[in-house]
Regions:
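Hydrophobic alpha-helical connector segments
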Residues: 1-27, 73-83
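Hydrophobic/aromatic-rich alpha-helical bundle segments in the mid-to-C-terminal region
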Residues: 44-45, 65-128
Length: 128
């Protein structure tokens, strides 16, 4: 993302990239493991010990995508939690409904919310 400027344009691009990761095979494999773990105690125990490390690795990649201007924002931690949980929930519809992820109406919403949370003063809302 070296070619993407800082500020809202970078946030828009970061959200596009993060959203795309929720449509890749590794995410769907993880989702299937989580679902199976609900009724498989040994699998649940194994995932419980590994999940924090995976989450930390994913977060490190996300931090690199966002860049230092964004990761230093006071509401960055809250924004990441909001985006990850929201994207994880929204993507479930794609398990049974084929549609282009880039046109999902949530993408524009996430971009507007991110701009408001990260740049509350002096930056226009991103329109996505």
């Amino acid at each position: 993302m070296a070619d993407v400027p800082t500020g809202p344009p970078r946030v828009d691009r970061a959200i596009d990239l993060l959203w795309a990761t929720f449509h890749e095979p590794p995410f769907w494999a993880a989702l299937e493991l989580w679902t199976a773990a609900r009724t498989d105690p040994p699998l649940r125990a194994a995932l419980r010990t590994e999940e924090p490390q995976l989450r930390e690795a994913i977060r490190a990649v996300a931090d690199g995508i966002w860049g230092p201007e964004v990761t230093g924002a006071p509401l960055y931690e809250e924004l990441c939690e909001l985006l990850f949980t929201s994207m994880r929930g929204v993507v479930l519809v794609y398990a049974f409904e084929e549609r282009p992820p880039a046109t999902d109406p949530h993408v524009a919403l996430w971009k507007r919310l991110a701009a408001r949370m990260l740049f509350p003063e002096g930056h226009a809302d991103s329109q996505g």
